[in-house]
C-alpha cells in the first residue's frame, strides 16, 4: 500500500485527542491528578517534537485585538508550563486594571480550543497553546475569557428554557459561529508608493478609480491566476491547523475578496478567524500583494466587513433557530427568536459598540449596507407566526414543501426558504441562524459573540423563570411572545434599510 503524498498533515490536537494520547480517561482538566498531568504534558511534548516544534507559546488574544505570544524552549516543557504562564500584565491594554508597577498576570490553558503547530518563515515551528489572560487579582485582560463565560451562561440558560418546555434529553447547548472575512489585495509595489495606505491601511488622498463596481461584474467573477494562487496557498497553510475554508470568491468591489471559514463553536471560531487574518497578511506578501483588512480602504468603493453567523445547537443535534414542524418545536423556535429580539432592542447600544471602530465609521451607512442603526430582520413568515401565537391563534403545520418550479425539465426544482435574505439588515434571520453584518473586518469576533451570547441569555433566563412558575405553559408561551412584541417589537424591521 503506497503512502498518500497528498495527505494533509494534522498539526492540531483537541483536548479529547490529547487525553487519548496520554491514555487518561478524565473529561476535564480540573480532574487530573499530578501523575496524569505529567502524562498529558509529555504526550503533547512528544507530539510537538514529531511535528518539528522547537518552542512553545501561550497563544492568547489580548485587548490589542491581535494574538500575543512569547516563545520558550520546548525542552523543559511540563504540566505547569502547559497550564499556566506569567506575562507582564501591565504592558498589555488593560483599562487601568493594572498600573505600571503591578506587573503580575497569568495565562491559563483554554481546553475548549485545539493546540496547534504554527510554522513561521524558514520552517521554524512553534507549539501554540490557546490560553486566556488575566491579572493577579483575577480580572480578565483579554477577549477570550469573557467569551468563554458568555458561552457557559447561554448554555445554562438555554438548558433551563428547554427543560421548562419539557426537554429532558438535551444536556448542553453550544454557540455555532461562522465568520466571513472580507479583504482587499493591492500590489506591494503600489503600496510602497503610497505612504498613506502603508501607514493607515487606507487611502487618504487621490482620484476616484476610473473603473469602480458599477458594472457589478467583479462579485463571484472568475478569480485571476495570481490571486487564485495566493488564495490556494493560504488555504493550504490553514488546513493543517484545523481551519477549514468553506468558500472563497471575488467580492463586490474591484480587488476585494472573501474567505468564509466552516462553522465551529464560538471560542474555536474566534481563534480560527485570528489565524485566518494573520495567514492572509503573511501569504499575500509572498505573492507580491498587500492584504488590506481596513474597513474602508478606498472612498467610493465598498468597504470590508466580517459577517458573523451565529446560532445555537444542543448536544443531541437540535438546531434551536430552525423553524419547527410541529407545535412543540415551533414554540421552542419562537421563544429563542424572542430572546434575540428582546436582547437586540434592550441592548442595541452594546451591539452597536461591539461593531464600533474608526474604520467602521467610514463604512457603515451612506451607500453601503448595513446602516449604523440596529434593527432585526425576521421576514414576513416568521413575523406572522410570532403575531399568531401572541394572539393565541392556531398555527397550521404543512408537511408539503414550498418548491420553486423554474419551468424547465432539465433544471431541478428547489426548496423555497421560509424567508428572503435581507442583505441591508444589521441583524438578519437567515433560515436557521442570525447574521450580524456590522462587524469590522479587522477586529476579533470575540466581543461581538460575547455580547450576543449575554444579551440573549438574559432573555432566556427570564422566559425560563416565567415558564417554570406558570400554571399553564402553553398560555405563558403566548404571553411571553405577546409581551416581547409589545415591549421590543419596534426593533424588527423587514424593509430596505437603505
Task: Name every feature range the model reports, one short phrase each.
Residues 107-294, 298-498:
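Glycine-rich, acidic/polar active-site loops that bind/position phosphate-bearing ligands
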Residues 2-108:
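Active-site core of metal-dependent hydrolases
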Amino acid at each position: 500500500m503506497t503512502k498518500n503524498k497528498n495527505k494533509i498533515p494534522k498539526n492540531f490536537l483537541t483536548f479529547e485527542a490529547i487525553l487519548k494520547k496520554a491514555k487518561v480517561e478524565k473529561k476535564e482538566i480540573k480532574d487530573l491528578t499530578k501523575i496524569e498531568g505529567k502524562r498529558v504534558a509529555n504526550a503533547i511534548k512528544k507530539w510537538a517534537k514529531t511535528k518539528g516544534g522547537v518552542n512553545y507559546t501561550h497563544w492568547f488574544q489580548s485587548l490589542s485585538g491581535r494574538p500575543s505570544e512569547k516563545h520558550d524552549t520546548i525542552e523543559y516543557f511540563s504540566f505547569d508550563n502547559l497550564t499556566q504562564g506569567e506575562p507582564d500584565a501591565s504592558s498589555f491594554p488593560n483599562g487601568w486594571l493594572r498600573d505600571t508597577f503591578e506587573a503580575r498576570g497569568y495565562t491559563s490553558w483554554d481546553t475548549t480550543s485545539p493546540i496547534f503547530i504554527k510554522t513561521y518563515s524558514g520552517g521554524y515551528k512553534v507549539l501554540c497553546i490557546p490560553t486566556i489572560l488575566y491579572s493577579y487579582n483575577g480580572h480578565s485582560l483579554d477577549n477570550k475569557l469573557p467569551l468563554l463565560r458568555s458561552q457557559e451562561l447561554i448554555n445554562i440558560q438555554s438548558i433551563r428554557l428547554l427543560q421548562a418546555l419539557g426537554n429532558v434529553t438535551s444536556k448542553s447547548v453550544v454557540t455555532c459561529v461562522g465568520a466571513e472575512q472580507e479583504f482587499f489585495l493591492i500590489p506591494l509595489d503600489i503600496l510602497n508608493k503610497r505612504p498613506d495606505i502603508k501607514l493607515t491601511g487606507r487611502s487618504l488622498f487621490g482620484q476616484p478609480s476610473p473603473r469602480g463596481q458599477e458594472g457589478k461584474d467583479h462579485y463571484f467573477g472568475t478569480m485571476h491566476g495570481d490571486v487564485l494562487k495566493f488564495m490556494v496557498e493560504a488555504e493550504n497553510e490553514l488546513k493543517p491547523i484545523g481551519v477549514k475554508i468553506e468558500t472563497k470568491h471575488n467580492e463586490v468591489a474591484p480587488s476585494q475578496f472573501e474567505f468564509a471559514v466552516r462553522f465551529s463553536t464560538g471560542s474555536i471560531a474566534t481563534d480560527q478567524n485570528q489565524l485566518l487574518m494573520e495567514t492572509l497578511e503573511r501569504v499575500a506578501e509572498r505573492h507580491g500583494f498587500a492584504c488590506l483588512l481596513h474597513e474602508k480602504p478606498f472612498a467610493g468603493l465598498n468597504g470590508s466587513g466580517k459577517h458573523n453567523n451565529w446560532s445555537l445547537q444542543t448536544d443531541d443535534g437540535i438546531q434551536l433557530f430552525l423553524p419547527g414542524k410541529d407545535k412543540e418545536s415551533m414554540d421552542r423556535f419562537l421563544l429563542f427568536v424572542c430572546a434575540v429580539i428582546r436582547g437586540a432592542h434592550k441592548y442595541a447600544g452594546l451591539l452597536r459598540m461591539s461593531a464600533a471602530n474608526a474604520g467602521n465609521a467610514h463604512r457603515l451607512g451612506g451607500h453601503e449596507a448595513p446602516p449604523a442603526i440596529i434593527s432585526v430582520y425576521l421576514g414576513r413568515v416568521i413575523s406572522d407566526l410570532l403575531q399568531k401565537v401572541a394572539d393565541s391563534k392556531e398555527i397550521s403545520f404543512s408537511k408539503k414543501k414550498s418548491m420553486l418550479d423554474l419551468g424547465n425539465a432539465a433544471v431541478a426544482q428547489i426548496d423555497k426558504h421560509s424567508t428572503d435574505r435581507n442583505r441591508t439588515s444589521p441583524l438578519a434571520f437567515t433560515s436557521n441562524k442570525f447574521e450580524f453584518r456590522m462587524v469590522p473586518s479587522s477586529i476579533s469576533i470575540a466581543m461581538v459573540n460575547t455580547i450576543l451570547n449575554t444579551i440573549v441569555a438574559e432573555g432566556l433566563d427570564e422566559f425560563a423563570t416565567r415558564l417554570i412558575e406558570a400554571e399553564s405553559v402553553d398560555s405563558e408561551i403566548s404571553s411571553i411572545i405577546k409581551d416581547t412584541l409589545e415591549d421590543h417589537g419596534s426593533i424588527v424591521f423587514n424593509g430596505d434599510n437603505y
